[in-house]
Amino acid sequence: MSDVVVVIPARYGASRLPGKPLLDLHGEPMIARVWQRACKSDATRVVIATDDERIEAAMQPYGADVMLTAPDHPSGTDRLAEVAARLELDADTIVVNVQGDEPLLPPALIDQVVRRLADDTTASIATLAEPIGDVETLFNPNVVKVVRDLHGRALYFSRAPVPWDREHFATRPDCLATDAWLRHIGLYAYRAGFLAAYVDWLPSPLEQLEQLEQLRAMHHGHRIQVALAAEAHPAGVDTEADLARVRRLIAEGEGAA
């Protein structure tokens, strides 16, 4: 297998939780707990990509590999591409985007998404999904849904409830009749060569409608492998309520790094 580089994009200026990467989680900044999780994967290198020297300073005592990147990247994917270019990675090197607000991420999921991409040489990206078990989640536009083909490749990602159950939703919109619905998990593995091409493309029409970056790759004909997550994927930290929940789980020992 090619080398695997995990990149953790960490922006200081989160709109809902300013300074989110440095929020305290029982004596450690959130970004440190994410980094510790990533280091337990089989990756050959873990890099924190940040736009702020405060994050770099906070991670120095840990001996973390931190790269200061441009402050004006429109997305985490663009930040990944900068890291891949500066590291002069081989085109076949697998680069994993681990969100900087997921301090409970199981390292096994990082390894799973890497294997999925390594096993399909025709794919440029691999990601994960998990079953949706309730109507509220299915119809929530903040939850991204994905539809796959027979080979596990993505057919489409949407904020809408896809696929649409024409028969049952007309009579029982409060009931899921099958297990056809999948929630996308935002953990990605890319080939470094793909990242170099991606940042030169303009946003695609469907990407702009749905506000989903991965649709840009599909617009240009790139395949995305989607594996069913081998274990539960704990939600990240987007709100004060999420922060309280994660702190409680860590206190109870469920979030041990």
UniProtKB/Swiss-Prot annotation:
One function term, GO molecular function aspect: 3-deoxy-manno-octulosonate cytidylyltransferase activity
GO CC annotations, alphabetized: cytosol
UniProtKB keywords: Cytoplasm, Lipopolysaccharide biosynthesis, Nucleotidyltransferase, Transferase
Pathway in which this enzyme or protein is active: Nucleotide-sugar biosynthesis; CMP-3-deoxy-D-manno-octulosonate biosynthesis; CMP-3-deoxy-D-manno-octulosonate from 3-deoxy-D-manno-octulosonate and CTP: step 1/1; Bacterial outer membrane biogenesis; lipopolysaccharide biosynthesis
Cysteine disulfide links: none
Name by which UniProt lists this protein: 3-deoxy-manno-octulosonate cytidylyltransferase
Cross-referenced HAMAP family: KdsB
GO biological process: CMP-keto-3-deoxy-D-manno-octulosonic acid biosynthetic process; lipopolysaccharide biosynthetic process
Function in brief: Activates KDO (a required 8-carbon sugar) for incorporation into bacterial lipopolysaccharide in Gram-negative bacteria.
Keyword Hydrolase: no
Catalyzed reaction equations: 3-deoxy-alpha-D-manno-oct-2-ulosonate + CTP = CMP-3-deoxy-beta-D-manno-octulosonate + diphosphate
The EC number(s) this enzyme carries: 2.7.7.38
Keyword Cell inner membrane: no
The family this protein is said to belong to: Belongs to the KdsB family.
Organism field: Chromohalobacter salexigens (strain ATCC BAA-138 / DSM 3043 / CIP 106854 / NCIMB 13768 / 1H11)
Location(s), subcellular: Cytoplasm
